[in-house]
């Protein structure tokens, strides 16, 4: 069950957002965005720290005005994770956060203003080694493209993106990534497919304004899953009307399902039925809650009966198959029997022991060079 992904990723140029590589042979980076008031430095720092604990690679922060820019500078000094400043309309805000140490600028060159203003932002980014994200969104296409196409379409999104790409290239700036987001899954997927054929820069994937926790997760998993399975995408952000930490969890779950990133437990569990020999749903809920802190990648199967249990358990690092008593498999081999008494406690202990063993084994491999 565990192993290399069969996906051949699209070749792209590598850029760096702080100390995080994006594109090329780098792992697909997981992003999120704060939803606190940026001027509330303490609240925003606390949220970023929670995101970092959840495993986020990069965090975007909205910077709508100069007061927020000054707050951003304070926030930057208090966190470790790379920060992207989300900026629209006022190019002076971009110049200020560049001075304050931003790791990436998210701009739309089309709404920054005149050529000299875009040039000033690009020069500031180049001088400080700051990459830029061109962020095209179906909800804010240029008026001439709205008139030309009548409505947002994949072709309109791509034309907008290429217009901005050419703009940066005219200024001899190549250190950028691009997104073409829409809330419609088919529109976003087709736009990314078209854009992937046109440029070599890394692609930032997302289904914008996807919805709440459940609906947004489904739409993002469908849309991003299609693209990632085709090898398209270098960094992802799951847009949810929910706690931003959930965006990180969903992002990793999507990548884990495609074997593109490994972090924490990959649970394989049956939906349960009347054949179950223990309460699968309760067991899973307890295990997921208890093991959130575990970052070691492990496959754990929790199957309620012997129909599919042995087969699934043999493919996992640790597998539990319901029976009388229940049977534990470790690395594909029967290991021990457990009754329903203290089942979760015993299983948690075995998983943590296996995780520690894996850490030790990996360290030994590294030590041997």
UniProtKB/Swiss-Prot annotation:
Keywords: 4Fe-4S, Iron, Iron-sulfur, Isoprene biosynthesis, Metal-binding, Oxidoreductase. It catalyses: (2E)-4-hydroxy-3-methylbut-2-enyl diphosphate + oxidized [flavodoxin] + H2O + 2 H(+) = 2-C-methyl-D-erythritol 2,4-cyclic diphosphate + reduced [flavodoxin]. Binds 1 [4Fe-4S] cluster. Pfam families: GcpE. InterPro entries: Dihydropteroate_synth-like_sf, IspG_bac, IspG_bac-typ, NO2/SO3_Rdtase_4Fe4S_sf. [4Fe-4S] cluster binds at residues 270, 273, 305, 312. The keyword Oxidoreductase applies. Its EC number is 1.17.7.3. Its cofactor is [4Fe-4S] cluster. Pathway: Isoprenoid biosynthesis; isopentenyl diphosphate biosynthesis via DXP pathway; isopentenyl diphosphate from 1-deoxy-D-xylulose 5-phosphate: step 5/6. It comes from the Bacteria. Converts 2C-methyl-D-erythritol 2,4-cyclodiphosphate (ME-2,4cPP) into 1-hydroxy-2-methyl-2-(E)-butenyl 4-diphosphate. Belongs to the IspG family. This is 4-hydroxy-3-methylbut-2-en-1-yl diphosphate synthase (flavodoxin). It comes from Pseudomonas fluorescens (strain Pf0-1).
């Amino acid at each position: 069950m565990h192993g290399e992904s069969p996906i051949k990723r699209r070749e792209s140029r590598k850029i760096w957002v702080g100390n995080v590589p994006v594109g090329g042979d780098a792992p697909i980076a997981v992003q999120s965005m704060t939803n606190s008031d940026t001027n509330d430095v303490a609240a925003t720092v606390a949220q970023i720290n929670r995101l970092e604990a959840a495993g986020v690679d990069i965090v975007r922060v909205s910077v709508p005005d100069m007061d927020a820019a000054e707050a951003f500078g304070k926030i930057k000094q208090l966190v470790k994770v790379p920060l992207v400043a989300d900026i629209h309309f006022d190019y002076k805000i971009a110049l200020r956060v560049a001075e304050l140490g931003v790791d990436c600028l998210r701009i739309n060159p089309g709404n920054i203003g005149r050529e000299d203003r875009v040039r000033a932002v690009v020069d500031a980014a180049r001088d400080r080694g700051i990459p830029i994200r061109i962020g095209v969104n179906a909800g804010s296409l240029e008026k001439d493209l709205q008139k030309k196409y009548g409505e947002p379409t994949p072709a309109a999104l791509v034309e907008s993106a290429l217009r901005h790409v050419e703009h940066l290239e005219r200024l001899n700036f190549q250190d950028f990534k691009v997104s073409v987001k829409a809330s419609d899954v088919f529109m976003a997927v087709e736009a990314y497919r078209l854009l992937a054929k046109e440029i070599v820069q890394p692609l930032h994937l997302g289904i914008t304004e996807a919805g709440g926790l459940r609906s947004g997760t489904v739409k993002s998993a469908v849309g991003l899953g299609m693209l990632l399975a085709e090898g398209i995408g270098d960094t992802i952000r799951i847009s949810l009307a929910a706690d931003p930490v959930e965006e990180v969890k969903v992002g990793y779950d999507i990548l884990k399902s495609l074997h593109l990133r490994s972090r924490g437990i990959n649970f394989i569990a049956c939906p349960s039925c009347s054949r179950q020999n223990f309460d699968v749903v309760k067991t899973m809920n307890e295990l997921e809650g208890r093991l959130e802190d575990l970052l070691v990648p492990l496959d754990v199967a929790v199957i309620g009966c012997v129909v599919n249990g042995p087969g699934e358990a043999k493919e996992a690092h640790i597998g539990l198959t319901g029976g009388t008593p229940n049977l534990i498999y470790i690395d594909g081999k029967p290991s021990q029997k457990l009754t329903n008494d203290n089942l979760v406690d015993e299983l948690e202990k075995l998983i943590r022991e296996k995780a520690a063993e894996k850490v030790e084994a990996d360290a030994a491999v590294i030590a041997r060079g």
